[in-house]
Curated annotation (Swiss-Prot):
PROSITE patterns: PDXT_SNO_1 (PS01236), PDXT_SNO_2 (PS51130). The keyword Zinc does not apply. InterPro entries: Class_I_gatase-like, PdxT/SNO, PdxT/SNO_CS. This is Pyridoxal 5'-phosphate synthase subunit PdxT.
């Protein structure tokens, strides 16, 4: 662990990285800090090696896959996930954490699965940008619904053994957990509700 002391208590804060190649990095950094983590950006291998956990933000999954290869992070990230590093993916991050990506993109520019969570995820399943929507949905483990913002959002079409469904929207799976990995099809980082990030920070400390 690379946890750092928390001045408010004797309990060290987990160092949680946010993959900062593309996507809404700043919003996740703010949410993680408010949830009690030491939040840092990750763009290089040495930065990936220094964190206790990683958030893969929303953005464009094919662009992120390309940049992971360009920055020589794809295989090291896969290896850290296989070793058990906690990870949270929102929207595009959910897509990349899957073992299988449906409608992965044009040949040569496909989104590449990191194989962190045993699930099949369909890209842009809820539609294009103009089909983006938001609403309140129940979330397992939280005492009241979360306000979920869906932007060109995916959904989960298959889950493996050991994957827990945490939320659904319109009958589709939109949040899951497997061990210390978490994924949501929506963007809790943009709403001001920090409960999903707090759930992840608590998972990192387990």
């Amino acid at each position: 662990m690379n946890a750092v002391p928390d001045g408010r208590s004797d309990k060290p804060r987990s160092v949680v990285g946010v993959l900062a190649l593309q996507g809404d990095t700043r919003e996740h950094l703010a949410a993680l800090t408010e949830a009690g983590a030491e939040a840092v950006t990750v763009r290089r291998l040495r930065e990936l090696e220094a964190v206790d956990a990683l958030v893969i933000p929303g953005g464009e999954s094919t662009a992120m896959s390309h940049l992971l290869r360009e920055f020589e992070l794809l295989e090291p990230l896969r290896a850290r996930l296989a070793e058990g590093m906690p990870a949270y993916g929102s929207c595009a991050g959910m897509i990349l954490l899957a073992t299988e990506i449906l409608d992965a993109g044009a040949a040569g520019r496909e989104a590449t699965p990191l194989k962190g969570i045993d699930m099949s995820v369909r890209r842009n399943a809820f539609g294009r940008q103009v089909d983006s929507f938001e609403g309140d949905i129940p979330f397992v483990g939280l005492d009241s619904p979360v306000h979920a913002v869906f932007i060109r959002a995916p959904w989960v079409e298959r889950i493996g053994d050991g994957v827990e469904v945490l939320a659904r929207a319109d009958g589709h799976i939109v949040a899951v957990r497997q061990g210390r990995m978490l994924a949501t099809a929506f963007h809790p980082e943009v709403t001001g509700d920090r409960r999903v990030h707090k759930l992840f920070v608590d998972m990192v400390s387990e």
